Amino acid sequence: DLVRSRGLGDVYKRQERYLHLLSRGDKIGLTLIRLSIAIVFMWIGLLKFVPYEADSITPFVANSPLMSFFYEHPEDYKQHLTHEGEYKPEARAWQTANNTYGFSNGLGVVEVIIALLVLANPVNRWLGLLGGLMAFTTPLVTLSFLITTPEAWVPALGDAHHGFPYLSGAGRLVLKDTLMLAGAVMIMADSARDILKQRSNESSSTLKTEY
């Protein structure tokens, strides 16, 4: 029994060490969240300058009451859609006339700026806070696509499983933006906490100087 008790005690101590180690991972986790958000916005933002990526967001933009006005002919998008890797000159010409690529380029610039602001947090917390706010706002718009975009749901092509709650591939990608939303809240809170801490330190230094 004594040997068994000692063995259990050793296991308990090892668990304690691992738990203490994991409990200190919040700062590392925040850094990883910040880097992940920056990577996603930077990578996808740069892809917005490539025609296939611009083409892929056409259904979302064309059906969105917040964005469709950026397109010249949003109501005609379905007959001009292409698959990734597919090249159709007539579809490409329509997308050009539709301002698909002009809008996508502008969106790409915004997304790259968000990534840079998020990465700027160690240098300037206010820039990091702004980046977090923009990263938070973006998923609010994209998640609305689940309501406005028919292509977000499995179409009725004969299978019994279609419509709500059966998300299509596009819908499943949009749903993952809930993680972006939560991550943005975390990095905003982290930046705000650091700003308040800096202000507190400055106030303390000022009081010490006065007295």
Predicted features along the sequence, with ranges:
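Single conserved hydrophobic/aromatic residue that forms the stacking wall/gate
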Residues: D1-Y12
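Membrane-interfacial, low-structure loops and terminal tails that flank and connect transmembrane helices
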Residues: D10-K27, Q198-Y211
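Juxtamembrane loop-transmembrane helix junctions in multi-pass integral membrane proteins
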Residues: R14, Y18-T31, Q95-G102, P122-L129, ...
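Functionalized membrane-embedded alpha-helices
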Residues: T31-F49, A97-T148, L179-I187
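Solvent-exposed, well-ordered loop and adjacent helix/strand elements within mature globular domains
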Residues: V40-L107, L146-V154
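Juxtamembrane transmembrane-helix termini
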Residues: L47-A54, N121-N124, T148-G158, A189-S203
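Individual transmembrane alpha-helices with interfacial aromatic-anchor signatures
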Residues: G163-G183
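Terminal transmembrane helical module of multi-pass membrane proteins
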Residues: R172, L181-Y211
